[in-house]
Amino acid sequence: VLGSKKVLVSSQDLVTTPSLKIKKKASKNRGLTRVKEGTLNGRQTFGTFVKGASNTLAAIAAERVGENPGKSYNPLFIYGRTGLGKTHLLNAVGNTVYDNNKDYKIRSFSAEHFTNKVISSIRSGKTKELRDSLRFDCDILMVDDIQFISGKEGTQQEFFHTFNALYDANKQIIITSDKPPHQLAGIQERLVGRFEWGFAVEVLPPDVEHRVAILQTKARSLGLSIDEEVLFVIAEKSGGSIRELEGFFNNVVGQASMLGNPINKTLVLDVSSRLLSTKSVDHRTIELIQKETAAFYGTTVQD
């Protein structure tokens, strides 16, 4: 992948501390930034986005859109499984544009929110106001999880005409989805075609080295020094998504902090065992409910 770079953690630089002391570094990032519509997460910037083979192409495309919105890669369509950083890139573009020109009218929301806006405007008789705000008072439209409008014909109709108006005016459109355009079921063919007009790019689950790089960035932000071997164990024991990785890491750090223990292999394995045990209990509980429900109705779980 263009610009991919394998990042490893040097054990010479990282030493396991006997006791955990989290030193939160002063962040230069703002919190939530209110834009024309919606908010931007100030912590999700290109500076905090860790590139790897799985996401470099998407990151480069997003960076270029952030520097020159409406000039290239329009629309920018980022797709991939949940928890891989699509929303982070969406916010990073918005933050870059906002920092460069605060006069830009940025509208950022989920596809579910867009659907609710359409329904609300119909009920209140303010459809024209909605259309005018989206089509003529917007420089950048960012919509997260577009797959949500699947099967919603009225919402798709509004989005189709909004897309056309913004595209014709050279306004930037950025969309995220869990699938590539051609695999979106229940979406009008004419919309799918427009999603493919620009640049569609996938983000994939990070490999082990990439996950370690993400963990190192996380650890540094907390002022922690963690041995390379321990980081690899965390990377291997966590799930495939960045969200799962960060969740597992937070559990490790949290347990170490509460018990006053160092972050080492033993602690990581203990956390892994605890989390797997919880999942196992949840799974057994679901099975029990299914069996009892089936017995009550005189049927089987398979039925």
Language model region names:
Residues 231, 249, 255-275, 286-290:
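Conserved C-terminal helix/linker of AAA+ ATPases
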Residues 102-138, 146, 150-153:
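Short glycine-rich substrate-engagement loop in P-loop NTPases that contacts/grips substrate
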Residues 70-91:
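Walker A/P-loop nucleotide-binding motif
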Residues 185, 198-210:
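Conserved AAA+ ATPase "SRH/arginine-finger" region at the nucleotide-binding site
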Residues 216-220, 229-237, 243-258:
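C-terminal helical "lid" of AAA+/P-loop NTPase domains
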Residues 33, 40-76, 95, 299:
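Pre-Walker A (pre-P-loop) alpha-helix and adjacent loop at the N terminus of AAA/AAA+ ATPase modules
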Residues 179, 190, 198, 210-225, ...:
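Conserved AAA+ ATPase "sensor/coupling" helix adjacent to the nucleotide-binding pocket
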Residues 119-123, 181-197:
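Short regulatory helix/loop adjacent to the ATP-binding pocket of P-loop NTPases
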